[in-house]
């Protein structure tokens, strides 16, 4: 039996010329010549480029099946791998047999025709959009980045911790969470105060989908020293923007005996590593993005990979913004959070490279961030990248119980719900720090695909959970 190869193996020169190979995949296009030849463009997802299958009318099923192949049909081809005479391709397969595995029922209504489709349209056929150049390229880049993240942290001595998806804690303290319940919606139990009685629910208390694995991974940090979590998170924000998803993935490392400077270094090393990796592993996909989606994206990745990030305090950033002659839509003032336009000005205009802004006012940051000695700012950091703005957010955590309790009171958080988190400060507390990186935002930045709905397989947004 002829060995089955991927199209990537055939095109990468791993196989000897004139060797008989079998490939499997889906038809992108088919064109026929008057000389009794058909040229089939076949893809299998293993690489960006399809391979050309040359079929002659000598095949037993040529008239009955081969000439009826249309975009989307699945097939198996066996034949000799030869040097191609056509432009823009090095190899092709001279078919000795073609087996049609699956037909497209009605080619005229098949959504993925051989033309350029808008990303908005492709969201409506999310189950078929991986068959397009753009989404298949995004998928391969996503895979390489995910593997590179695990490899980076493994090589740095981190342990991957699987934090829970169902939680009773709100890491962000914002309250924009999806509730998890098995209560009968037609017969909801109430307590003496007329409130929903969650003691009758599955977990015996009110529970939610997690907004972050940070609090849980801190517990393992206090025993394993260097850990990270990489998994799905959920936000019930009613935001229909190109930057928001209700379900997305987060990378959250946490280091014991560490301070703000340590995670600034870690974030820089990680981003540089990821940029180098994607350029090395996904050069064909990045060439496509650079040519058709976001001209300059390769240069941007090379710039980050080679740059030493600028570090400035929030106070200095505000001073620089106030001193600039730039007119901003949103006001610039100490105590206000930086908006995307401010972040991009700092990274693109002022510094012309990634910037790490540190020591933000405590009022605009999370309750768990360590209060600085000035009593006004916390040891927080945001990494701002040219072209997108904030891409990473992190902090040194508050390891002093009395100050953590005070911050929780100021944020109106119920300390009973965070008793286990407070225990981490009562039993062998240590300085520790970590950050969060939104995976989809990273992919969007790397590929230049501007809407995060197009870099996750099945986007979950307000009013949309169709698949």
UniProtKB/Swiss-Prot annotation:
Cystine pairings recorded for this chain: none
Entry keyword Oxidoreductase: no
GO cellular component terms listed in the entry, alphabetical order: cytoplasm
Cell compartment(s), UniProt: Cytoplasm
Top-rank taxon: Bacteria
Pfam families per the UniProt record, alphabetical: tRNA-synt_2, tRNA_anti-codon
EC number: 6.1.1.22
PROSITE patterns: AA_TRNA_LIGASE_II
Catalytic activity: tRNA(Asn) + L-asparagine + ATP = L-asparaginyl-tRNA(Asn) + AMP + diphosphate + H(+)
SUPFAM superfamilies linked: Class II aaRS and biotin synthetases, Nucleic acid-binding proteins
Matches recorded under InterPro entries: Aa-tRNA-synt_II, aa-tRNA-synth_II, aa-tRNA-synth_II/BPL/LPL, Asn-tRNA-ligase, Asp/Asn-tRNA-synth_IIb, NA-bd_OB-fold, NA-bd_OB_tRNA
Keywords: Aminoacyl-tRNA synthetase, ATP-binding, Cytoplasm, Ligase, Nucleotide-binding, Protein biosynthesis
Biological process per Gene Ontology, one example term: asparaginyl-tRNA aminoacylation
GO molecular function terms listed in the Swiss-Prot or TrEMBL record: asparagine-tRNA ligase activity; ATP binding; nucleic acid binding
Complex formation: Homodimer.
Official protein name in the record: Asparagine--tRNA ligase
Organism: Legionella pneumophila (strain Lens)
Gene: asnS
